[in-house]
Amino acid sequence: MPSQSVKECQRCNALTKSGQRCKNRTCKSGKCWVHLKRDTGLRVKPSQVSGGGMGLWTTKRIKPNQLIGKYTGERMTKAQVNQRYVTRKPQYVLCSGNRCVDARKTNSSAVRFANDARGTRFKNNARLKGLSLKSASKGIPAYREIFTGYGSAFWVNR
């Protein structure tokens, strides 16, 4: 299966107001933080979760049940995931049935930075549906971190 943007860092893929390609470099999504915020209303910055690394934040209100983004990366089967991660746990792998996406080395989507609020004082305010992230039925206020449940399979042996 084809992969999507499997590079550690790249030039921003957004266009400036003058129609030129942005010259900023990005390592977290396909767009630099300026264009990610402008085009999607999202930011990647440190999480409020202790040990959570980076988190996905909104800069504008997200309506109830609104698509936040798609989980993208290297497309794999569960068997391929098991072969790759024999000695370590997959941190950025999301599976829906036998279809899996490994976003460990991709920067095509900021959705991979949504953390799970399990075991914290925060509550999940978004949900994964297949390989897409949607806001919960109440929506998400502006300037909040986006949390989603990873599912019980993720938490086995952690």
Sequence positions of predicted segments:
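Intrinsically disordered, compositionally biased terminal peptides
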Residues: 1-9
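C-terminal SET catalytic tail plus cysteine-rich post-SET Zn-binding segment of SAM-dependent SET-domain
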Residues: 5-6, 118-158
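Cys/His-rich Zn2+-coordinating "finger/knuckle" modules used by eukaryotic regulatory proteins
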Residues: 10-38
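Eukaryotic intrinsically disordered and solvent-exposed regulatory patches
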Residues: 18-19, 52-58, 132-136
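Eukaryotic short linear interaction motifs
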Residues: 19, 64-65, 77-78, 142, ...
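Intrinsically disordered, low-complexity regions enriched in proline, serine, glycine
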Residues: 21-24, 34, 70, 80-81, ...
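Catalytic cores of histone-lysine modification enzymes
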Residues: 39-121
